[in-house]
Amino acid sequence: MTQTLSQLENRGAFIERHIGPDAAQQQEMLNAVGAESLNALTGQIVPKDIQLATPPQVGEAATEYAALAELKAIAGRNKRFTSYIGMGYTAVQLPPVILRNMLENPGWYTAYTPYQPEVSQGRLEALLNFQQVTLDLTGLDMASASLLDEATAAAEAMAMAKRVSKLKNANRFFVASDVHPQTLDVVRTRAETFGFDVIVDDAAKALDHQDVFGVLLQQVGSTGEIHDYSALISELKARKVIVSVAADFMALVLLTAPGKQGADIVFGSAQRFGVPMGYGGPHAAFFAAKDEFKRSMPGRIIGVSKDAAGNTALRMAMQTREQHIRREKANSNICTSQVLLANIASLYAVYHGPVGLKRIANRIHRLTDILAAGLQQKGLKLRHAHYFDTLCVEVADKAAVLARAEAAEINLRSDIHNAVGITLDETTTRENVAQLFNVLLGGSHGLNIETLDKDVALDSRSIQQSMLRDDAILTHPVFNRYHSETEMMRYMHSLERKDLALNQAMIPLGSCTMKLNAAAEMIPITWPEFAELHPFCPPEQAEGYHQMISQLSDWLVKLTGYDAVCMQPNSGAQGEYAGLLAIRHYHESRNEGHRDICLIPASAHGTNPASAHMAGMQVVVVACDKNGNIDLDDLRAKAEQHAANLSCIMVTYPSTHGVYEETIREVCEVVHQFGGQVYLDGANMNAQVGITSPGFIGADVSHLNLHKTFCIPHGGGGPGMGPIGVKAHLAPFVPGHSVVQIEGMLTRQGAVSAAPFGSASILPISWMYIRMMGAEGLKQASQVAILNANYIASRLKDAYPVLYTGRDGRVAHECILDIRPLKEETGISELDIAKRLIDYGFHAPTMSFPVAGTLMVEPTESEGKAELDRFIDAMLAIRAEIDQVKAGVWPLEDNPLVNAPHIQSELVAEWAHPYSREVAVFPAGVADKYWPTVKRLDDVYGDRNLFCSCVPISDYQ
């Protein structure tokens, strides 16, 4: 039969590229699970009353090439002015060797958060380097492995200051008036929910205020002034006030470390170490504190430990501080950090080294000095005598200056009374400075760059002598040996080889949705039209961004069944926080601000209670029945008991137990009956798209993990995006922004992140995914995700009991394998199985969540039948190994499971085990071998001997 032109055009070609099993393989798997078709399987699993009659209308699929061309045209509407706005964002030069070998490399961007350290040593080393950079530049003892952005880090610093303060009755937090406005905005949002009073005043007046538990200062003020706060910090410390200082990585190369001046906490953005502005993000924040406060620090910390053979190995330390363990008592709710961006900054420091960084910082400062000298020579006045890279210039005719700047395609900071702000960066040249003279002075000014350079080189006093750094930085060998591109390329490759990412094998982590991050989706993020825009540039310069964001928002509205979407949250956890704040403010608008009870099922992800606590709510736990579903009787009782103060319920759908609960609509109705709102966690949205939707189910607000369902890669632990969808009555209460007016905002709510649209530069990834999949492709993706999970469950259920199932014994898009009976019989644990899977070439499933002693498996739709079968065969082979232990063939204390993973050096070492080397490292005929570089880590040693800076170089060799 002759094919039609439409068939030959094959506009849905990407659907077949994204979805792993082809039609024939899908039918094989359907036969294995006993279903006739994808629609029949979905019909059996998803409750009838929540199934959509037709898929959401998000358009037909486009080919990769058509979608790229369409997005390129949209990006072309952005105007690439040279931005000297500053305010925490500058243009950068990302070294091409890092661009090609990390940012564009799936070996780096498709990895997961390093909870399994044995398969994560490469990015853990890069993160340890990031911590070392932070320690050297801040002068403090402990550093985290990144936070979401600078403003979030400021809010975390405030919360930490309260936790560690000895002034228990103090409830006021002082913020210096020249911090960045977006930082103050986010701090105020957080302070409101915690009940703190925020005082904003000139830093010199910090001592005038009583009952202050913490103070936030900024070393280089928002308008450029360098402050020597050593005397003030000393006086504040005498009063037992916790002092936090916001700092700039590049400025710290030349300026004295705030830790050396007595600061307790130092934080800031690492953006200018090689990470493009990207219209606001993603960017990594750095965070450091004194050793005495280490157990109160937010975020992840990479620590040096030992493996089972006594060799140095790295791991995430002190995880008991995190939300997946401590729930509402966690230090923060940060589930996603910014690993990929922290590692770019880390490798930027490695590549340039201390000499290169000082050259860059000195060049920026020299050009700023030249600009300042020329302007002063022509009679213009500078607001500040001491500066690093930013000048605040008083101008008589501000409108004329701004008009000349616009004509020259230059952005200056324009929100300062009778003055303009100018921030230079590593991309600034002498030609740029000459152009700035023309903009600020008009025509024939007669200034000569070379002459000015000679003058300032002989006598520069723009940095106070007391503020000049007098100690060495980055002395560790890792920052002093990889300065040629060849060496750098090989170093990065050596790190990459240590890790297991999606470019090598399936990552079957439950509740994580480790699906394909297609190359066509990733390409646009490095386009300069998207990468080079300042988040506070005039809106007419970002029309392409606004069109793309508007289209993506419209698609997400249709896919979720909500009425509006807010793009600001930088992670799923931050989305939860933003959604709960919207609920809180909604109740307050109805004079029901007393409603503060948040119902959370016992099965919930730990981020839920941590977010509720952060939003100022009290958590009340709702029981689950023996099948893992929400206990409706207990829900009704709790809702009625707390009816007067009920704020909301947080529920995940499909449930965290991997089933579609039949009573989800009834759950929503009960909560609404007693005046509460329904927060539906979007972590499992990959099993809803095109089949049902939160809004259709009856929820009021959800966050969407764009780094799960909508293909933004996990980056080894970030970036992420957690936009929230809301019903119309909550739309006025989503986050706003103090610097940029967000279109459609009816009221001005506080911000939750530094940039108005969060990590805007990675939104093209989700735009591309939806555009290339279309309505039918998105539905098919959800259906195949469900098929893949049920195929695994059906083939493994006789070897490993599936803990929870729904109707007809089916699961949703993931399944929980119960290891507890095996452990009771044999002593082999879920940890042993997880580590043994490494020998088979797999990342482990999610361990002991949501139920201790289990493994939760989520294959996603992107894995083909061959990879699923390989995983199933590995799990069955491991079950056979467990039976060998049970039968006494191998002793419990010495077998391939408890000794896993095995490393290459064991092949040539003395062998005294009761199983062969072949069984150890090539089990069940494994051919495409992944080699871990360390054996199982000693977690207890790592936490008891916390060490978070670089180890001797010999340990890397």
Curated annotation (Swiss-Prot):
Pfam families: GcvP2_C, GDC-P. Keywords: Oxidoreductase, Pyridoxal phosphate. It comes from the Bacteria. Its EC number is 1.4.4.2. Its cofactor is pyridoxal 5'-phosphate. Gene3D superfamilies: Aspartate Aminotransferase, domain 1 (3.90.1150.10), Type I PLP-dependent aspartate aminotransferase-like (Major domain) (3.40.640.10). It catalyses: N(6)-[(R)-lipoyl]-L-lysyl-[glycine-cleavage complex H protein] + glycine + H(+) = N(6)-[(R)-S(8)-aminomethyldihydrolipoyl]-L-lysyl-[glycine-cleavage complex H protein] + CO2. GO terms for cellular component: cytosol; glycine cleavage complex. GO terms for biological process: glycine decarboxylation via glycine cleavage system. InterPro entries: GcvP (IPR003437), GDC-P_C (IPR049316), GDC-P_N (IPR049315), GDC_P (IPR020581), PyrdxlP-dep_Trfase (IPR015424), PyrdxlP-dep_Trfase_major (IPR015421), PyrdxlP-dep_Trfase_small (IPR015422). The modification N6-(pyridoxal phosphate)lysine is found at residue 708. The glycine cleavage system is composed of four proteins: P, T, L and H. The glycine cleavage system catalyzes the degradation of glycine. The P protein binds the alpha-amino group of glycine through its pyridoxal phosphate cofactor; CO(2) is released and the remaining methylamine moiety is then transferred to the lipoamide cofactor of the H protein. PANTHER family: GLYCINE DEHYDROGENASE (DECARBOXYLATING), GLYCINE DEHYDROGENASE, DECARBOXYLATING. This is Glycine dehydrogenase (decarboxylating).
